[in-house]
Amino acid sequence: VKRSDLEKAVVAACGWVEESQVVIFGSQSVLGSYDEASLPEEAIRSMEVDMTPASAFTTGADVTEKVSTLNVWVGEDSPFHLRHGVYVEGIHRDTVVLPLGWENRLVAFTASGTGDDQNYGRTGLCLHPIDLCVSKLIAGREKDHEFVGALIRDNIIDPAEVLDRIDKAGIDWSSGYPDNRDLAVSRARSWLQSKQAPAAEDYSDIARALSTVSRSHPRTIREHLRTNTSGAQDKSETAHDVGPDLSTERGYDLTD
């Protein structure tokens, strides 16, 4: 999916539900923050845009009928899908698990146009990329790990930031979440920790030890090493000189 595809989906969805805003969940919400050219292929592979009418959050309205409208008129196998190649999946908020406070960090993706354009001002409110990654990792499916892993690999997302969001914000669990919540968080944290770069090794103790030796002895470290190496070579040469010539004693020549 490209940003131009997302714009078409937002405009069409807003038109069908007669609202100026929709909230975009799922992987394609990352396009609210980044152009597709800066994203890895794994992040924009899906042609599905998960969304729900914004009135579900702004007024607490029951959007069941509007969600159904989205699925019929701009959903999978709809005329919109067949024409544009992208489709909308209308969802309910209680199917998504997100960090607490996610609604205060939404990124507005507004359709281009002018004040005279009927599509002007139609907006998709996209998840913040860090909140999106938390949601993906709590779900914990293979495709979710692939998505977040690609963003980390390309240095778009820092795993430490995602860990920090989990630990400091906490999780806004949906009432219908069926799985073990503690286990879901533990798995997400473990996966993120495995993606963090290993800490640089600390060689300060070795440096201090070498410094102490150099101060306490008049010879330099290089001289110490040269002396030790020379001694080892002398011993090796001596041992070779006194060794018996087995080929002579046994009366045969060594061959290749």
Where are these regions (language model features)?
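Compositionally biased terminal segments of proteins
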Residues: V1-T212, G251
